[in-house]
């Protein structure tokens, strides 16, 4: 076995199937997951945790120690992968300007443990602690606290028998959720190691790897197919779950259930546009009014009219923006690109075409989301201009080679279509 993995959240059924097949031992399953796979709940400590990102369930976080990175890239071939350059629970020292590396540090402690990696550009610290997968130990008021997942009174009393002697010596102990699944002897030895590490300031090897994966629509559809092999699952299950949790559960009680009504309900008169960059950061583009839509069991197509105001020039096209200019753009669940046609607000003449290459767009309530693949194409006065290919190569550190190759393949396909006057 490669390691023990705990999986939580809306992707749990599909990911349990996938990581089991990759020779990981699945532990601490929910009763529902255990029953779906006709297994007993495996009450053992986890080395790695995979779960929904609490701020956006379109992303997952993976944390712990083990050789899972390559498998993550292979499982999520068409998604963005961010690995924290600073380990979770590692001990760092901030400089005088309250930064560490290129990241801002809050609060500005001289030394502390990382309790939030810098996925948003900021490291959050707490006072220095010795940390293992079972517990945290540090000098303080001599109290014991528990993970929110340790809520059984008997279990808390069991753990207190070990931490109380340390409390009397002035150590704080926080029990992590894994502690429930370890023996008293394992926990006693672990606390002894943590005290030694804390007193000797031996934090060099402390910390857990942290990954944030922004899931694409193609990878969500793959998870749909995996889940479908285990339990009734409609197409777009994992996408729809982001907006309609209970409604999807209700729909799937009917084996002939169709996602069409839920897909239609996601489309409002005006749609926002969430354009996600390779490092996982979202840019909100000017949204647009829906002027045409088509939804069926196989997918969806939405055409927007976006009003373009302000000064400056059209990116890639190079023509000046004038009052009343507008963009007509189609988002199609089957296509890895969107064609923006920019028109003059004065005489409705075509100013130019800009093609954004991305993963196929997904729908959330009133919003279109896709992963931007950096490389784009502009058509200016019959000239074909390939934009930002160097950015694709630079940002490939966040992508599986399959996604990089797909972006280049789509760009070449579009160039051929333009040259043959077959651009639709």
Swiss-Prot record:
GO terms for molecular function: mRNA 3'-UTR AU-rich region binding; RNA endonuclease activity, producing 5'-phosphomonoesters. It comes from the Archaea. Pfam families: DUF402. GO terms for biological process: rRNA processing. Probable RNase involved in rRNA stability through maturation and/or degradation of precursor rRNAs. Binds to RNA in loop regions with AU-rich sequences. Belongs to the FAU-1 family. The lineage of its organism: Archaea, Thermoproteota, Thermoprotei, Sulfolobales, Sulfolobaceae. The gene is fau-1. This is Probable ribonuclease FAU-1. HAMAP family: RNA_binding_AU_1. Its EC number is 3.1.26.-. Keywords: Endonuclease, Hydrolase, Nuclease, RNA-binding, rRNA processing. InterPro entries: DUF402, FomD-like_sf, Ntdp-like, RNA-bd_FAU-1.
């Amino acid at each position: 076995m490669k390691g023990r993995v705990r999986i939580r959240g809306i992707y749990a059924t599909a990911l349990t199937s996938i990581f089991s097949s990759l020779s990981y031992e699945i532990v601490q399953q929910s009763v529902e997951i255990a029953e779906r796979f006709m297994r007993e709940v495996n009450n053992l400590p986890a080395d790695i945790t995979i779960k929904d990102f609490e701020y956006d369930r379109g992303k997952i976080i993976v944390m712990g120690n083990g050789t899972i990175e390559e498998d993550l890239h292979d499982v999520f071939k068409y998604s963005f992968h961010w690995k924290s350059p600073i380990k979770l629970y590692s001990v760092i020292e901030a400089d005088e300007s309250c930064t560490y590396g290129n990241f801002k540090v809050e609060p500005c402690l001289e030394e502390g443990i990382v309790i939030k990696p810098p996925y948003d550009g900021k490291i959050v610290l707490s006072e220095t602690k010795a940390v293992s997968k079972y517990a945290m130990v540090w000098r303080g008021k001599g109290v014991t606290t528990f993970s929110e997942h340790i809520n059984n009174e008997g279990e808390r009393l069991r753990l207190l028998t070990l931490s109380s002697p340390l409390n009397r010596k002035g150590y704080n102990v926080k029990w992590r959720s894994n502690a429930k699944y370890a023996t008293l002897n394992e926990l006693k030895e672990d606390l002894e190691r943590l005290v030694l590490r804390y007193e000797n300031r031996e934090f060099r090897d402390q910390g857990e790897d942290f990954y944030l994966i922004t899931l694409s629509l193609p990878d969500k559809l793959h998870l749909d197919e995996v889940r479908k092999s285990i339990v009734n699952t409609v197409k777009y299950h994992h996408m729809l779950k982001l907006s309609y949790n209970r409604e999807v559960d209700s729909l799937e009680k009917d084996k002939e259930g169709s996602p069409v009504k839920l897909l239609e309900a996601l489309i409002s008169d005006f749609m926002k546009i969430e354009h996600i960059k390779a490092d996982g950061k979202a840019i909100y583009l000017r949204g647009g009014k829906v002027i045409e839509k088509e939804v069926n069991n196989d997918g969806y197509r939405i055409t927007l009219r976006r009003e373009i105001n302000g000064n400056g020039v059209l990116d890639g096209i190079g023509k000046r923006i004038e009052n009343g200019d507008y963009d007509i753009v189609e988002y199609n669940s089957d296509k890895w690109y969107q064609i923006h046609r920019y028109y003059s607000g004065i005489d409705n003449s075509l100013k130019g075409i800009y093609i954004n290459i991305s993963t196929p767009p997904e729908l959330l309530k009133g919003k279109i989301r896709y992963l931007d693949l950096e490389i784009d194409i502009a058509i200016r006065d019959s000239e074909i201009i390939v934009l930002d290919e160097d950015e694709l190569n630079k940002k490939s550190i966040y992508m599986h080679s399959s996604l990089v190759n797909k972006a280049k393949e789509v760009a070449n396909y579009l160039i051929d279509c333009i040259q043959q006057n077959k651009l639709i």
